[in-house]
């Protein structure tokens, strides 16, 4: 977002359209030409795209109310999740992302629902009716929030990639974004 924000400040005529969705939805929009870029937090083949991997990875964890007894733990184990009413990422469930992580506890996982975007799911957690398995930094867990995040242990992480179609002539604004994004990633190297 920093690179995009800088471009908007430097070029007042550049306009953006931010769309949220899961990886499948974003890939479809990219293929149909509805969007120029997609940010994917998923381990999947990127052979059909140009892509840049962002240096940071996203860590999975559990969102709960701050007054929940699990909030006292530094990390959440598979055993901690057994029999809890869980809301899981629809995409992660479809891709069997957690099968090896929770191992033989699979039958003890009480998945009461799935979500494609985290906002509505966190409302259920705030009501105390569910726990949310999601990435860190996707919910508001500031001091005034009643929610908190605890990472899963052992750690389960995902890479983040910015992707765009191959063999497509990009607009000048899109070319500028790619150039600046590459330059910003070089500072991490």
Model-identified regions with their sequence ranges:
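Ligand-binding cleft/hinge of the Venus flytrap
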Residues: 3-12, 80, 95-109
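Flexible hinge/capping segments at coil-to-helix
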Residues: 49-60, 64-86
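Secondary-structure junction motif
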Residues: 84-106, 170-174, 178, 188
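Extended ligand-binding regions for polar small-molecule ligands
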Residues: 5, 79, 159, 163-189
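Central regulatory/effector-binding core of bacterial HTH transcription factors
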Residues: 1-46, 115
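Beta-alpha-beta core module
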Residues: 47-53, 57-59, 120-167
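Short helix-loop capping/hinge motifs at secondary-structure junctions, enriched
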Residues: 67-77, 154-156, 167-173
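Short loop/turn segments at beta->alpha junctions
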Residues: 22, 77, 116-117, 135
